[in-house]
Amino acid sequence: MSETILTAENLKFRYDSEQPGYALNGVSMQVRRGEFVAVLGANGCGKSTLAKHFNAILLPEEGNVYVEGMDTAEDDKLYDIRQTVGMVFQSPDNQIVATVVEEDVAFALENLGVPPEEMRRRVDDAMKMAGIYEFRERAPHNLSGGQKQRVAIAGVVAMRPDCLILDEATAMLDPRGREQVMQTIHHLNKDLGITVVSITHYMEEAAQADRVLVMSQGNVVMEGTPKEVFSQTEKVRSLRLDVPQAAELRDELVKAGIPMPEGIIDTGECAQALYELLK
């Protein structure tokens, strides 16, 4: 089994072939099996367009996209690709189709003709993994935004994908809802080994990833660990992005003459550094 699960090679795509500008302009990147990768970028940079290529919702105009070595342009690979890569979108209401939580989680499995006993097991497992088992008999419209998004995640997880693509899946949630969803995502990644690619504009979420890609004007312009990327605060800001609050605080303290170590990106590190200075 290949260590690389997702690959883009010189990927070019535009929504209107009669217009000169490309939404993706020569993207080359890889995602390794089991990684948690965050993809950042200002609005219109191409990050959601890239995400849709990994599930073959969109196909390259030029270049190639491979999912576990399968070319997304090959029609006979489409079923296997979508079994391998599941997607969760921004609005959970657009993905929920049933009137009872457990029926919604089972929806795709029913369409695939999965035997009832296996379906029951997979649905229960997925709801427990997503932390919504207690809501299984409730109507989705009575749940909070974060709970609905976890229902959508459970529906994808029940398909047993190797990779989960989150296309701004926390964008419409309040802070508590975002926290609930991210706890679920980290559990799926760290405990179950599911590869995660998260398209996000929340820097604190990206700071928890294994690796960060920053996109601008249809290409990847920065790549590295969260520390490597967010330590370059001026470059990140020049791309019309924020930095994690802890990194911003660290910069302000340095400007005020307080010696702070490089690479601080979370509040715990910042608090520890200040504690060491005050001892």
Describe the predicted segments one by one.
Residues 40-42:
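The feature captures the beta-strand-to-loop junction immediately N-terminal to the Walker
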